[in-house]
């Protein structure tokens, strides 16, 4: 077995382990953040400052009975959370999380694969996760799950169009689909960040990413007041945990991608080293998603579609046209 294959396998294992652990810890952070905004304490009983709440929740999920409803399609019911997990982690393959570094005289590239269509690969594989809520809702033999599945189809497909069109303008400026090349394009300093050259693209992509991540205010797929838990209604135990671990993995992936594409990625930020800089940027966008959840109410499905097709899509197309004109001039 070649050294490249061994190195890639080790990277995959580290990536899955690290982001699985971060996904579990993010549940604690989010509960603490929401509690702060709502003037509560949040988790505080299990361990110091409630830090062991993550371990307690993990043990609970692993030991809960795995229930499959009568009349459900067992194979598809089991396959859906696996698709969610696989799409979340595979989409991370082209993301350069840190700058290259040397370990024991061997240069390490902290990404799985530097493919020349990395950004497109990230969006395409990540969007394959849409099949998870669709299949989960169809296989559950439950009307609330079915409604959540229908909402997933409408919402995720609609915003996939917007997010794809939105990234075209920044890619026209950079001239490459590689996330590594996009990062290097902004290496000149603070003013080279694409957020200053493409502010509209940043805002549109951020909103579209919240819709694709099923984050508030776009969490129509599992709106508790309307459809119980949506496509997850019949899930319990480990399968239920896999859905939400995939959701947090997607959140971390989008946070890193937004940091790389619009905010200089892992380039040094003044006196702050690049590796620490990208962690600060990605951490801010994870926190921002929690802040938005605590601040904004849910939107109705018709409001969501109106915003997508009547506002965001025309703005994305207008941004492409204006960017093309500026490049030609």
Swiss-Prot record:
GO cellular component: plasma membrane; respiratory chain complex I
Superkingdom of origin: Bacteria
Principal cellular location given in the protein's record: membrane
InterPro entries in alphabetical order: NADH_UbQ_OxRdtase_su1/FPO, NADH_UbQ_OxRdtase_su1_CS
PROSITE patterns tied to this protein: COMPLEX1_ND1_1
Keyword terms of this UniProt record: Cell inner membrane, Cell membrane, Membrane, NAD, Quinone, Translocase, Transmembrane, Transmembrane helix, Ubiquinone
Broad enzyme group: translocase
Keyword flag ATP-binding: no
Catalytic reaction annotation: a quinone + NADH + 5 H(+)(in) = a quinol + NAD(+) + 4 H(+)(out)
Family the UniProt entry places it in: Belongs to the complex I subunit 1 family.
Official protein name in the record: NADH-quinone oxidoreductase subunit H
Source organism of this protein record: Helicobacter pylori (strain ATCC 700392 / 26695)
